[in-house]
C-alpha cells in the first residue's frame, strides 16, 4: 500500500506544519542545492519534462498524453519516460500494456503505454538512452522534475487550480517538493489546470519571473450519459475529491464514495465490498482510468469489478490549441542549440 499525504498539507498551515518546519528547512536546502548544482546527463533526443511543484497528482499524466498526441500529429515519434512508481520491476523495461500489470510497472506507465512507446527505469538516464535506441525522436518525461538527473529541453510545471500548492510549506510540513524559487528557475513554463483561484499567487509569481503561463482544463471524453444515475464513485488517486467533482458534473447522483491512497493495490476484501455494496443498493460503479488499470482480470473478483465499473475518461485540453505545438517547438529548438554547444565543446 502507498501511504497518503497528510490532509493538513492541503489546508491552511497549522501547528503541525510549523512544528515540522525545522525538518522542512533542512529538506529544502538539500532539495534546492540538488536542483541547482547536480551534474545532469543529456539525452540524445529532445526531452520534455512534465512536472509539478508538489507531492501527489496535479494532472501530469494527462498533460503528458496531450503533448504526445500533438507531437504525433506533427509527424514525430514521441515516447514516455517514467520511473514506474508503484511497480515492482527495478530494471529498464519497455512497458507492454497487454503483458504487464500495474504491480509490475506502475499504473501511470500502463496508461502512457496505451498512447506511445513507454519505458520505466529507476535511473532515468538509462531510460532516456533506451528510448533513443528504440527510435523515439522526442521524449516526454512524466514527473522527475526535481530529480536533477537529466537536462530538460523544456520543463512544463503543472499546477492544479483548485489545490494550488496546498499550505505552501516544504515536505514534511507541506507538499512542496523543493523551494519555489529553485523550481521556477529550472522551469520553462507553467500550466494552470482546471478552475479555481488556489494557484493564482503562484501564477503571478511565475509571470513576474518571465515564465509563460498556459491554461488548460480536463474534459470528459467517454461516451454515455450518467444524468440522474445513482452511483458509487471509487478512486485511489492523489485527489479523489477532484474526481468526485467530475462525476457530479456529468449529472450523476453520487450516493456513496470510496477513497483509497494513490497507486493503491486493491485487496480482495476491498473489491468484494465495492461490488456487493453497489449491487445491494442498485448503484452504478464509476471510477478513473488509472484505477481501472490496477485491477487484474482473472484474479479473484477483480475482473468482475472491472466489468461492472464505468470509467470516466478525461483528457487535457489547452485553451490555446497552439500551445502544445509551441512547447514542442521550443523543446526542439533547445535541443538543437544544446547539441550545437556540445559539438563546439567537444
Swiss-Prot record:
Assigned keywords, A-Z: ATP-binding, Kinase, Lipid A biosynthesis, Lipid biosynthesis, Lipid metabolism, Nucleotide-binding, Transferase
Superkingdom of source: Bacteria
Gene Ontology cellular-component annotations: plasma membrane
GO annotation, biological process: lipid A biosynthetic process; lipopolysaccharide core region biosynthetic process
Keyword ATP-binding: yes
Pathway terms, separated by semicolons: Glycolipid biosynthesis; lipid IV(A) biosynthesis; lipid IV(A) from (3R)-3-hydroxytetradecanoyl-[acyl-carrier-protein] and UDP-N-acetyl-alpha-D-glucosamine: step 6/6
EC numbers on record: 2.7.1.130
Alphabetical list of Pfam families matching this protein: LpxK
Top-tier EC class: transferase
Binding site for ATP: 54-61
GO molecular function, a single term: tetraacyldisaccharide 4'-kinase activity
Reaction(s) catalysed (UniProt annotation): a lipid A disaccharide + ATP = a lipid IVA + ADP + H(+)
NCBIfam families in alphabetical order: lpxK
Family in the record: Belongs to the LpxK family.
Role description: Transfers the gamma-phosphate of ATP to the 4'-position of a tetraacyldisaccharide 1-phosphate intermediate (termed DS-1-P) to form tetraacyldisaccharide 1,4'-bis-phosphate (lipid IVA).
Record's protein name: Tetraacyldisaccharide 4'-kinase
Gene, per the UniProt record: lpxK
